[in-house]
Design a protein with these regions (language model features):
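Nucleotide-sugar donor-binding and catalytic loop/hinge architecture
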Residues: 1, 216-231
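N-terminal subdomain of nucleotide-sugar transferases
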Residues: 1-49, 87-89, 114-118, 254-255
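A short, basic/aromatic alpha-helical/loop segment that forms part
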Residues: 14, 211, 239-244
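A conserved catalytic-core segment of Leloir-type glycosyltransferases
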Residues: 29-93
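Short N-terminal targeting/anchoring amphipathic segment
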Residues: 84-104, 118-125
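Membrane-proximal helix-turn-helix segments that form the acceptor-binding/catalytic region
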Residues: 115, 142-181, 189-196, 200
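Conserved donor-binding/catalytic core segment of Leloir-type glycosyltransferases
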Residues: 182, 226-243, 249-252
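Carbohydrate-associated surface elements
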Residues: 187, 208
Length: 260
């Protein structure tokens, strides 16, 4: 029986956690074993869960990130324990989601993966994998990641290791011979093709929705208590500029006579 192991910061919690859970359930319906390794925050899962590290590991890793700009470069013992677990599970496919956020040492993980024949699928939910440390660069309008990060414009760190981080990621991720990158949008795909990962196999798979709930229907707007031609809803876990808050407000102004 083939085995899928996914790695994400959460398990069946939040957007990426629920995406991993859905993928695991889909794999199990097709006869696969499913494991999800996670750093923190979880709810009940139908997959086999593998906890990575402890709360103390998370706190120490957070300090490494905040004080030393070393996200993804702490949690040595926790990641070595995960690698040992991977060798026990013997997965046919390792699918990565968000491996940042204070729980995993990506150098230790990729030094292991790069020596194996395991197929690695990495779903890109943000831009962290090909930048010096930021998840999104649009707000800063910074394109250094296309060549080489350094002297980061995000001045919210005591130490700037953006160039060092960028070069380490480039060295490790580029050497993963069985890596397939799965951007969740055409826009993300266009960015990956401008990064140091442009020569990797890139397959766009857009985030899905439950079509039994979200489907096209015919409605009688005149009988609606809202009495509006149509409605627009925008959803985000947190509302910030980089999440599209400004664009949503702009949409409201343009469609001032409609409800969204």
């Amino acid at each position: 029986m083939p085995t899928l192991l996914q790695i994400n910061v959460t398990a069946n919690w939040g957007s990426t956690g629920k995406i991993a859970e859905a993928i695991g359930q889909s794999a199990m319906k097709r006869g696969w074993n499913s494991y999800i390794a996670y750093g923190r925050k979880m709810t009940t899962s139908k997959s086999n869960l593998v906890k990575v590290g402890s709360k103390m590991d998370n706190y120490i890793h957070f300090a490494y990130n905040y004080l030393l700009d070393m996200e993804g470069r702490s949690s040595d013992r926790a990641t070595k324990a995960l690698v040992r677990r991977i060798t026990e599970i013997k997965p046919d496919v390792v699918q990565l989601h968000n491996i940042h956020d204070h729980f995993l040492n990506y150098a230790i993980l990729f030094e292991y993966l790069n020596q194996t024949e395991i197929q690695v699928v990495w779903t890109f939910h943000d831009c962290w994998a090909f930048t010096g440390h930021c998840y999104h660069f649009v707000q800063q309008n910074c394109m250094k990641w296309q060549t080489e990060c350094g002297k980061c414009v995000q001045r919210n760190r005591f130490v700037d290791r953006s160039r060092e981080n960028f070069l380490l990621k480039k060295s490790l991720f580029s050497k993963c011979k069985n890596l397939t990158i799965v951007p969740c949008s055409d826009w993300m795909s266009s960015l990956v093709k401008k990064s140091f990962l442009k020569d990797k196999r890139i397959e766009v798979i857009k985030n899905g929705v439950d079509l039994s709930v979200f489907k096209q229907t015919t409605s009688n707007t005149q009988s609606s208590p809202l009495n509006r031609p149509f409605r627009i809803i925008a959803v985000s876990n947190v509302w910030m500029a980089y999440k599209g808050l400004n664009s949503t407000c702009k949409c409201n102004r343009i469609l001032i006579n409609n409800l969204f």
